Every structure is written in C-alpha cells, then in structure tokens.
Amino acid sequence: MSQWTPEFNELYTLKVAMKSGTPDAPTTQESLKAVLLHPQPLGATKSFPAEVEMINSKVGNEFSHLCDDSQKQEKDMTGNQQEQEKSGVVRKKRKSQQAGPSYVQNCVKENQEILGRRQQLETPSDEDNDSSLSECLSSPSSSLHFGGSDTVTSDEDKEVSVRHTQPVLSAKSRSHSARSHKWPRTEADPVPSLLMKRPCFHGSALRRVTCRKRLVKSSSSQRTQKQKERMLVQRKKREALAQRKYALLSSSSSSSENDLSSDSSSSSSTDGEEDLCASASENPSNPAAPSGSIDEDVVVIEASFTPQVTANEEINVTSTDSEVEIVTVGESYRSRSTLGHSRSHWSQGSSSHTGRPQESRNRSRISTVIQPLRQNAAEVVDLTVDEDEPTIVPTTSARMDSQTTSASINNSNPSTSEQASDTTSTVASSQPSTVSETEATLTSNSATGSSVGDDVRRTASSAVPESGPPAMPRLPSCCPQHSPCGGTSQSHHALAHPHSSCFQQHGHHFQHHHHHHHTPHPAVPVSPSFSDPACPVERPQVQAPCGANSSSGSSYHDQQALPVDLSNSALRTHGSGGFHGASAFDPCCPVTSSRAAVFGHQAAAAPTQPLSIDGYGSSMVAQPQPQPPPQPSLSSCRHYMPPPYASLTRPLHHQASACHHSHGNAPPQTQPPPQVDYVIPHPVHAFHSQISSHAASHPVAPPPPTHLGSTAAPIPQHLPPAHQPISHHIPAPAPSAQRLHPHEVMQRMEVQRRRMMQHPTRAHERPPPHPHRMHPNYGHGHHIHVPQTMSSHPRQAPERTAWELGIEAGVTAATYTPGALHPHLAHYHAPPRLHHLQLGALPLMVPDMAGYPHIRYISSGLDGASFRGPFRGNFEELIHLEERLGNVNRGASQGTIERCTYPHKYKKVTTDWFSQRKLHCKQDGEEGTEEDTEEKCTICLSILEEGEDVRRLPCMHLFHQVCVDQWLITNKKCPICRVDIEAQLPSES
C-alpha cells in the first residue's frame, strides 16, 4: 500500500470515470478493447468529492506498495493522476464488482485477454501486480462499469487506480468491455491500461470497474450531506446507466458477474499476501471474472488481506446492480456503515439492471455485499435479487468470507465488515428484513468486526486455511466439472482458465438470468437470513476443501468456473472468489447460500439453482446460511439443492440453465437439483453436504438448513455426481444430476415429495403396493415387502424370499434409489402409486389372498414372478388367470366321472359294508347305529333318501350325483378325503 502512487490514483480516476461514464462507453467488446488499449483518464471527466479524496489519501499510504507496478500504467491515465493520488489509499478496499448481466459475457473475454496481459505485467512485480490486480478487480471495474458514482468517484477512482495499476489493462479491459456491453460509456475508460497493468485481472478488474465502487468514508450509516448528494447523483447516473445496461443486461450481467467472481477468487488466493497482494491474488482468480466479468450488479468486496488494509482500514465495496460501492473502513470498519449506506444507494441505482432500478438496487445492495464473496455470475444475479431477495446477501457474505479467508481472518473481518456495511446499506435501501439479518450479522462485524469477524473467522478459519492452502485443487475439481459448464457458457474465454472463464461466465450468465428473474422474487430475501455470517461460514468451508485452488490465478479460474460450480465457489478458498462462485451462480448454491438447489431449494441447486437456485436456492440457502456451521458444510453445496433442487419454480428454470453451467443449478441442486421441493433434501435441491460432497444444490428448498449442514451430505448421496462434486466443482456432476431439465427437476421433486408423502408406502415399490398396502405395516416399511401384506401368513417367508426380495432388490433398490430417481422413474413412480390404489383393491376385494399366497402365486410357482406381473395389471386379469390355471388339472370331464365312479340308486341297507364300516368307526355305538340307518351327503348335508341317485367315489364315499358331479367338474378329488377319483378305482366297482 505504501507504494501507492499518483499513477494509481489516475487509474482509479479512470476506473471511476468508467463507472460514471458508462453510458457512452462502447457497447462492444471491440470498443472495450480499444478503450483498454487506449484508456482515457477518467479523472478529467470526473471530479471527486473531498471526502472521497480524503479516503483515498488514507488508503493510499497502505496500498502504495501495491500501486508501484500499476503506477507505470497509471501514468497513462495522467489526467486522473491527481485524483488517483487522492484515492490511492482507497485501494485498501477490494472493490467488489456488481453483477452486470451484460458485462459478464463481455468481460469474460476481456478478462481472459487481460489475464494474459496481467501475467506479462505481473512478471516485473508479482506482489504489486497481485495487489494492484485485486485493486483493479475490486475498484476499477466497479467504478468504471457502474458509471457515475459521484460520492465514490474520487475514492473509487483512486481505489480503482490502486487496484488497476497492475491489472490496469485487465481492469480497464474488463471494465470497459463490461461497461460497453452493459452500459455505453462516454468516457474512454483507463481500464485498458489498468488491464494491461494486470493481465490476470483483466476480465475481473474490468467487471469490477463495471461494478461501480463507492468509496465511503468511515461513517457507514452517517454520511455527510455531501456524500448523500453524491450518492444521489451517482444513483441517478447508475440508474440511467443501468437502464441502458439492462437493455444489454443479458450479456453484460454475465460478464460483470464473472469479474466479481474473479476478484473474489484472486483475493482468496493470495490470502497470505498483503492486502493488495491478496488483491492481486484475487485478480489471478479474476481471470475467471473476465470470463464471467461481474456486472455492476455484482459487488466485489475486495478485502485487502495484508495488514496494510486492516479490518478497520479495509475498503468496503458495496455494489448494487449498477455499481459497486467501495467504502474505506478507515477504522473498525467505519466505512462499512458508509458502505452500507452507499450500497443502499447503489442497490437502488442498479435496480435498473434487473429492470427495477430502485427495488433491484436495494436488493442488489444486499446482494452486493454478498457478491464480493461469491463473485460469480449467480452472485451478480443474486445481487440484484438480494435487494429483494436477501439470498444474495449471504452469498456476498460468503464470498466476502471467501475473500477474507483468502487474505486472512483480519482481512475476512474487513471483508465481512464491508459486507456488513453493504448489507446494512441495503437494508436501509431495500430489504430491511433481509438486510437486517445480513446487516445484523454484518453490522456486528462492522461495529467490532467480531461478529462478522466471527462469521468471517468461521468462514475465514475455514477460508483462511483455505486461503492458506490455495493448493486446494478447486480448480482441478471445478475445472473438469466446469468444462461441462464451460461448454454451456457461450462467452467464457480460455484466456484465463478456459474452465474458469467459461464457468465464470456461465455462472455470471445464469446469475444474470436468474438475477433478472430473481430480482422480482422475494424468495431471495431469505438469503439475508443466512446473511454474511452464515454464508461466509458455509462458503469458507467449501473453500477450505477448495483450498487447492491455489493462487490468485488458480483461484481466479476456479472462481470463473464457479458460476458453474457452486461447490467451486465455496471451494474458492480464496475469499471473494470462492464464495461468490459457488453461491452466486449455482443452483447448488446451497453450497454458498443454499442456492438451488436448491438445488439448488436448490440445486441445485440449483445451479438451478443458478440464479434460480440463487433465488430459490438463495432463499433456501438463506435459511441455512444463518446456520454458519451447516452453511460452511454446504458452502460448496449450494443447492444446489438443487439443484435440481435448488429451486423448483424459478429455481427450476434457472437451475436448468444455471445447473447446466455451474453445476447444473443448480438445481437440485440439485440438488440436489435437483429439484427443489424435495429436490432431495437428501440430494442436493439438491443442496450439499459440504457441498463438496455435493452441494445441497439441489439444495432442497425445505431441507437447506439441514441440507446445508447435514443434508448436504445426503444430497451428495442422491446427487453425488452433481452435487457432491460441488466441492470439487459441483457444477459438472451437479449439472448432470442437477442439471436436469426443469421438467426432470420437477419430476424428481415430485418423486421426492411423493416419497415423503407416502414415505412408508414407498411409492417406488410399485409391484407390491397392493399387497403391502393391505398389510398393517403398509407404508411404514422402507422396503416394500409384498409378503408383508401376508406377513402374518406362515407361507409368506419363503415367498418373500423369492418374490419380495426380488422386488425389494430390483424395484426398491433400482426404483427407490437414494433419491436420485430418473425422470422416467418419477413417471414410473406416479403410476405405481396409482397401482397401489388399483392393486390395493385386490387385497381388499380378496382379503384372504394375503392368507393364501398360493392363490396369488398359482401360476408363478409361488415365486411371485407371475404374481408381480398380474398384480401390476388389474384385478380382473388376475381373476382370469386364476380361472385358467384353476381349471387346468383340477376338474374331471363327465366321461371321467362316469368311468371312475359308481352311480346308482341309493338303497338303505344296514348291512351295507359301507354302513358297517362307519358304524365301527363310531365310538358311540348308539349314535352310530342311529346314523347307520341315515347316511348324509357331505356336500349338501342332506340325509340320503331311498332311491335317490347317488354316486360312490373310488374312496367309497357316497354323495348325491348332482352334488358330487358339480364338485368333480371343478375338482376331481373326493371332497372328504381328497383322493383323486382317477388315482385308484375301487376293486368292487
């Protein structure tokens, strides 16, 4: 920080100019490139308030060392040097980019290019470049992209300069591209030079430039009148820009978002480095941002991890849909309050991003706070949604935590402080309740830094270790999985990390999609529930697993991938990146914020939830997020429920799209999705055991809380491929599981709900439904034991072995697998339920069938094979089968009866040998004697009369011909002794 120079201030000014001048900026990447290559000093175009300058002065000293490298680039922006000198100190804060739908896509490419440039530039001063890169990521892009932030202009420009000095090219490029796509900028952004300064940062910095940064002084809530006025002016500018930008929302949002993501990532990467260094580290992650540059909507709170930016000095970057606010927390997160207020402003201003400038902004405000942590496309969307949907806040918090984690606990606290401030402002601005939660959480940090610090520590402890072990191969985990998503993202460029780029863009893209969708959805507000603390905790954990995401570069890539990978976002051990990636985009966001999956609620996921996950998942995650512990475990899980489970409604839709990119989102899941309703509380909604095993991404909306913490694991079970990988990169597996078509997600959710509803019934066990339905325990056993229906019957045991075991193994195991029911299974299950009802009739109609399994299994050899088939059919079929089988070897033809029996006229003869035999058999002689004279037909129980036609069977039993003939037609055995009439012919006959 000590190396910060006027040149950096120039950069900052340029960045701010980009922010405020967004309207006229080129709307094409070419224009952005041109601007990047030939940045115009923004300082000349803008004048910054004295307060901002003061803040810049404060921050400049600390960040000057980071600015050394960027100074060279800053010199290109001589017009802004003076202002940048003032705002040089601002670098301390990591600017958080706000998600801008349009910027994400454009910035991804820009970021990739910038990444290359930054790598080249970083060669001279790696540490400075990293720091500057972070600065660029945090400050320039947001400032430049958001266009017009009077209050923050000076500070932002300074901060931007600081951050962009090294990644000047990156920041400018990203900022410019994002800006041009999102909102035309009149000013030639100095982003190109900034980007050139920091190639790695390129996309992310640019995005951050896109995300307007607001540098607020110490007071968070208490802003001077001047600041308020500036804020109002900025808000107006942002709204105008946002409206323009939102026209281009779909593309710019993605880019912007990615920027945010990358910034966050790089920050967490460098964790060990100084604030600026950490920032630079984040910048490397930022390359992911370039692929999915964060929009103005995305707030990248770039927490300086070095002592230079202490918790109190850390600059809080608050962003709304349109811009990012950077608040310098000069002391004890003083800025946080300001930032919060700023954020409210920005949220309102950037509302237009979602089409509701004010409402979105407010939501964005909260989301902005979260955005920095998430820093992924979903983040951006979440930001906008967060205004209305607190979900974003947790994401930001998580992202911030990730950043913080990357930098250090202290840094985390500052980040959290920033988030808290942002959240607070958001609360004031929009989502009081949502923000309240976030604000309360963040405010505590803001006041003492301990509350957020704790959360951050939770996250940071998770995250710091994560940042400590940047080696965590989140990138590898994410990348492979991102690659599926990567394909999805149209504009992810391989410049940075192909996967990270794509995923970032994907995530951002979806985030923007979701953002647009979610902004209107209050569901997101739930996110604030799990606000920063929970989110940070959640994310960081995932990040820790993702610690492998080693340095800024890796983190950057992962972050970019994160949009695809909810888990990744969490995996992004490096603070902002990790969090934002997973939470923001994926439906699996459950990882980050239980987004979808939810699955995802949401999964998610997911991925769904993506934004949908964000919306649904966010809301879902939001609930769990308040539970820091569960959240951390779910941090990588986002939802993902699914999510396939991330969010069924909107989440489903988004999960489908988001899930595809990030984990499917989502979506899930999630899902874990997949989706969301029951997106598998166990799967994702697909949410996210640690989402690493699988996010809840399909975060199941309902299960997110447990899902995040404990359900997360279950979700991995069900959506293991999609959501479990979340830690590695839930996106890929989650996409497969959570990335189910919304229809599939719905089916899965329906199946799960059905399961839950008929839990004991086990709808999936169709074959025996009717049998066990009759059984008293029907619906109580997880396994369907058709024999259970006849469990009381002795015969049931063997049959159960053959038939029931087969059913249980085949049907129960196959059909009722963990919860990962295939869409077709879902269809199958529904019919089985019907079968339950239909077949249930059979046991009811023939109650004794349970007692006589042989009746059921007559044709199946009592093995149940045939029985299962018939029972699946209708009862009538069974009856017919029974008749056919019954008549097969049982009745005797009339000819056989005549041939084998002795028909004659009954004659009472007491001496009849037959009567004599009966007499001797009787113990009671008297009765016997009495009966000897009166024989009865045992079929009709009538006394045989003299002269009646009777038939004597080979066994010598006598019956009325009419009675016995009817019997023999159906059964050729003696009704009394069961001897076959053909078995032995009487010798006398």
Swiss-Prot record:
Annotated region (Disordered), positions in chain: 63-195, 213-293, 335-367, 388-475, 506-559, 641-675
Biased composition (Polar residues): 97-109, 393-451, 548-558
Enzyme class: transferase
Motif SUMO interaction motif 3 (SIM) in this chain: 380-384
Keyword Cytoplasm found: yes
Short motif SUMO interaction motif 2 (SIM), span: 323-329
Annotated spans, Ubiquitin binding: 902-904, 952-956
Zinc fingers (RING-type), renumbered ranges: 937-978
Oligomer status and interactors: Monomer. Interacts with SMAD6, SMAD7, AXIN1, AXIN2 and SKIL isoform SNON. Interacts with (phosphorylated) SMAD2 and SMAD3. Part of a complex containing RNF111, AXIN1 and SMAD7. Interacts (via SIM domains) with SUMO1 and SUMO2.
Family statement drawn from the similarity comment of this UniProt entry: Belongs to the Arkadia family.
Name of this chain's protein: E3 ubiquitin-protein ligase Arkadia
Organism of this sequence: Mus musculus
Name of the coding gene: Rnf111
